[in-house]
UniProtKB/Swiss-Prot annotation:
Source superkingdom: Bacteria
Keyword Hydrolase: no
Disulphides: none
Gene that encodes it: rplI
Single Gene Ontology MF annotation: structural constituent of ribosome
Annotated organism of origin: Flavobacterium psychrophilum (strain ATCC 49511 / DSM 21280 / CIP 103535 / JIP02/86)
Function: Binds to the 23S rRNA.
Name of the protein this chain belongs to: Large ribosomal subunit protein bL9
Amino acid sequence: MELILKQDVQNLGFKDDIVSVKAGYGRNYLIPQGFAHMATSSAKKVLAENLKQRAHKEAKVVADAKTLGDALKAIEIKISAKAGGEKLFGSITNIDIAEALAKGGQSIDRKFITSGIVKRTGKYNASVRLHRDVIVELAYEIVAEQA
C-alpha cells in the first residue's frame, strides 16, 4: 500500500514522502491518525506540482537551519547536576539539554535532540536534527553541582 505522509513519522519518513507500508499499518494507524493519505495517481501529480513550487523555499529553510546549527555549535553547554563523585543522582536526558539550550538563547524542541541517557559527569555529544538534511553534533559537559 502506497501512502503520502502528511507529517514526519519517526522511522518511516518525512512529510510529503511516498512510502510503501503494509495495508494494516496504513488503514488502521497512519490514515486514521491523520499521518498519511492514499497515494492515488492524481494525488501523486498534485504532490509533484507542490514539491516543484516549494523547492526554492526549501533552499532558504536549509540555509536558515545551517545558520542555526553554527550558532548552536558556538554555545558552550554546561549542565550541573547533583552527583556523588562521578556518578549522578538521577540522569541527564534530552529534556535537560533542551533547557540548557533555552538558557543559552536557542529554543530547540526536545524531540529533535537525540542523546543517550547520561548518568556520569564528563563531556558528551548529542545530535540535533534541525531539518531533514541538517543534523548538528552538539558537545555538552555535565558537571557536579556545587553544594
